[in-house]
């Protein structure tokens, strides 16, 4: 266990070091300084020189705000969360929305859904339930190198549906490195060293990629999906339920994990090592070290099952009862969070209750503020008339094949998110796609869903996602290798996303992809 802890610490340090390399003592990097000036400059130039006859002044003003905020999001001139507070200042100044209307978007139901999801995830991490779940899955799947690789991917993918992909990968990487070290230590005379090296590269990448892929399984798995839910409701007044998305998301995750596993094992890092020396023994040893399931783990497990059941049954059960007919996914998330705050812990030396308010220090408040800023900006775009004007301008695309538009959007967002924040990317592009759907005469989810899913999928560069940074920080993979392997995983993801959105999603959600929805 000491080795496990040592490597977890090492990964954390390398992960943090990777991100801190670009941070100099200067208050702004060159790119940030350019963005800091360019954002307000675009705002002023738009107000002064852009005056289409059919766009009211309020629409011009919101377009100017959007350009300013988008520039600061892309360049990270100031922290992304801080940029997301600009609508609170700028929208009332232009008399687009009242302060009350703007502020209410920062307390939207979907924000509380994500808040509750984070609290549940932190409870799992606090009492180490996620480690037990991961090790149990790996132990059950098998001992061959192929099965160990698959076991790590399934375990990481499952965890990242409910906890952050960063936390899932941070847990799994040290276990993977410990297995690799054990294999080197117990290496037999007839074992090919190259095969072990190929296996360790494939294992490290498999963990990182599975952490990213797993987030597509549930609405709380990744921020872009929460943004999709919010923007869809904001623009069209319809809801994507937790249960219905799982019917779309989980098969997508299973297929993507399966194909990525085959690619890593038999194409990218093909090797002849069938069994890993000491691999299965080490997994069992880790499970034994955890001991019997503790009271607190059982409580969190029970609450987790309860939350899942409520989310899954809300659409077809809770809505049928008058008392619970108005319950939303966010209501359930906060209900289970409050239960975690109420239930006492037995190990009071560690914590008095399953969750206490110390959890506030671990919550990603910046992400929640970003959600609110995106929703406030979307409301401003709608209320100012900018959305309708954009729709009119995009009507020239009417007649273009919808599948071609979906392909272009998916590939564009996939590669854009390699160098920009996936959350900021989704926040910027989804309102545009909502308007585009009306212009080209298709259902909005045909364009918005693949963009949100693609925004989550970055496999090529360490800066693409935190999981990529973590696996790069392990020292087992180079940027060149990550980019070459990740490029093909990007293309695999694009193909699967397009097929799911075009052929599976319409059946599950009961929508006609050729039927546009009117903007609110």
Curated annotation (Swiss-Prot):
One of its GO terms (biological process) is carboxylic acid transmembrane transport. Pfam families: Na_sulph_symp. It is a multi-pass membrane protein. GO terms for molecular function: organic anion transmembrane transporter activity; symporter activity. InterPro entries: SLC13A/DASS. The chain crosses the membrane at residues 30-50, 55-75, 77-97, 104-124, 160-180, 207-227, 242-262, 298-318, 323-343, 362-382, 399-419, 428-448, 452-472, 491-511. Keywords: Cell membrane, Ion transport, Membrane, Sodium, Sodium transport, Symport, Transmembrane, Transmembrane helix, Transport. It comes from the Bacteria. One of its GO terms (cellular component) is plasma membrane. Belongs to the SLC13A/DASS transporter (TC 2.A.47) family. NADC subfamily. Mediates the transport of the dicarboxylates fumarate, malate, and succinate across the cytoplasmic membrane via a Na(+)-electrochemical gradient. This is Sodium-dependent dicarboxylate transporter SdcS. It comes from Staphylococcus aureus (strain USA300).
């Amino acid at each position: 266990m000491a080795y496990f802890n040592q490597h977890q610490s090492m990964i954390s340090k390398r992960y943090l070091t990777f991100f801190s390399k670009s941070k100099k003592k200067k208050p702004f990097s060159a790119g940030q300084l350019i963005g800091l000036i360019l954002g307000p400059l675009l705002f002023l130039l738009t107000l002064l020189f852009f005056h289409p006859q059919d766009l009211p002044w309020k629409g011009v003003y919101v377009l100017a705000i959007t350009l300013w905020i988008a520039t600061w999001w892309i360049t990270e001139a100031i922290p992304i969360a801080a940029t997301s507070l600009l609508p609170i200042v700028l929208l009332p100044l232009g008399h687009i929305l009242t302060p009350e209307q703007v502020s209410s978007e920062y307390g939207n139901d979907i924000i509380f859904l994500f808040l509750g999801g984070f609290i549940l995830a932190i409870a799992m991490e606090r009492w180490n339930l996620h480690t037990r779940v991961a090790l149990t899955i790996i132990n059950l799947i098998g001992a061959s190198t192929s099965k160990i690789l698959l076991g790590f991917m399934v375990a990481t993918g499952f965890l990242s549906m409910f906890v952050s992909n960063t936390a899932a990968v941070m847990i799994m990487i040290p276990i993977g490195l410990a297995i690799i070290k054990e294999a080197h230590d117990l290496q037999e005379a007839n074992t090919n060293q190259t095969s072990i090296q190929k296996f360790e590269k494939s294992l490290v990448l498999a963990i990182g990629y599975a952490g990213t892929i797993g987030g597509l399984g549930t609405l709380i798995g990744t921020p872009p999906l929460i943004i999709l839910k919010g923007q869809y409701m904001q623009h069209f007044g319809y809801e994507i339920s937790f249960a219905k998305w799982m019917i779309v998301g989980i098969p997508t995750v299973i297929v993507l994990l399966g194909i990525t596993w085959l690619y890593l094992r038999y194409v990218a890092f093909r090797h002849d090592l069938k069994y890993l020396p000491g691999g299965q023994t080490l997994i069992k040893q880790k499970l034994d070290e955890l001991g019997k399931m503790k009271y607190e783990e059982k409580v969190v497990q029970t609450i987790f099952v309860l939350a899942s059941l409520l989310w899954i049954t809300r659409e077809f059960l809770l809505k049928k009862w008058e008392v619970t007919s108005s319950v939303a996914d966010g209501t359930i998330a906060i209900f289970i969070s409050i239960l975690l705050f109420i239930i006492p812990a037995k190990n009071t030396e560690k914590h008095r209750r399953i969750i206490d308010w110390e959890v506030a220090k671990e919550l990603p408040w910046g992400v929640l503020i970003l959600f609110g800023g995106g929703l406030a900006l979307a409301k401003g775009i709608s209320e100012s008339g900018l959305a309708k004007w954009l729709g009119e301008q995009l009507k020239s695309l009417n007649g273009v094949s919808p599948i071609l538009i979906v392909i272009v959007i998916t590939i564009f967002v996939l590669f854009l998110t390699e160098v920009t924040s996936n959350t900021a990317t989704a926040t910027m592009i989804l309102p545009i796609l909502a308007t585009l759907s009306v212009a080209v005469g298709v259902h909005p989810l045909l364009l918005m869903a693949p963009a949100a899913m693609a925004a989550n999928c970055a496999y090529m560069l360490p800066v693409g996602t935190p999981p990529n940074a973590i696996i790069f920080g392990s020292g087992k993979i180079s940027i060149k290798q990550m980019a070459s392997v990740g490029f093909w995983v990007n293309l695999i993801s694009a193909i699967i996303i397009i097929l799911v959105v075009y052929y599976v999603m319409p059946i599950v959600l009961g929508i006609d992809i050729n039927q546009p929805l009117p903007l609110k």
